[in-house]
Amino acid sequence: RADYVVSTKVGRVLSSGPELDEADGYIRPLSNKVRYDYSGDGIVEALEGSRKRLGTEYIDIVYVHDLGAFTHGADNIVHMEAFFATGFEQLIRLKEQGKIGAFGLGVNENQVCLDVLEHGALDVILLAGRLTLLDRSAQDALIQACQNAGVSLVLGGVFNSGILATGAVDGATFDYFPASKKVLSDVRRLEQKAEV
């Protein structure tokens, strides 16, 4: 077990549900109902489900998944309140109890990272799509905040949900949606530079 690292995400509690062709932006997802819960109890429930599915008691890294306005819009206020009221402290307790090794965020936006870092210390942030060839928005404030706080930054979504892998083709996606004309133009410029 010491030869590899296991990470999981919390914030979404899964239960049995009907088979669907699409749900929450996922095509043909597993037949689960998803309930967002960033409270201490919700984090424990999601973590227990992950442990059972993964067949392990110890989780090296726990990411709080999709906290932020990118996913929740105006409802994010309620989720942030639940997280700050009991979720954050629950993660600290789980780490102190030796049930997890580290915790942080797994998100698609910079601002929620900065907001949570003001509340308390994280070990790691998994940031999707904000430090890529197309989107450099994490470059200044967030990187500096992570350096100041000693927080590791893991980059995810480095292809911006597809377009940096497919190129500027019909049906290309950027941030999980069809790419705009501007993004397509930006990618074409990158492709031209890469050919030189």
Which sequence ranges carry the predicted segments?
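Short amphipathic alpha-helices and their capping/turn segments at secondary-structure boundaries
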Residues: R1-V5, I43-Y58, Q139-S152
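N-terminal binding-site loop/beta-alpha segment at the start of enzyme catalytic domains
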Residues: R1-S16, G25
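Short, acidic/polar
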Residues: S39-R53, N108-D115
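Short, flexible, mixed-charge acidic loops at enzyme active sites
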Residues: S16-Y26, A168-G171
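Active-site mouth loops of central-metabolism enzymes
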Residues: I27-V44, A74-M80
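Short acidic capping loops at alpha-helix termini that bridge into adjacent secondary structure
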Residues: A2-Y4, E57-I61, G101-A102, D123-V124
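Beta/alpha (TIM)-barrel catalytic core signal, keyed to glycine-rich beta->alpha loops juxtaposed to Asp/Glu
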Residues: L67-V196
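Active-site groove signature of glycoside hydrolases
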Residues: G49-D75
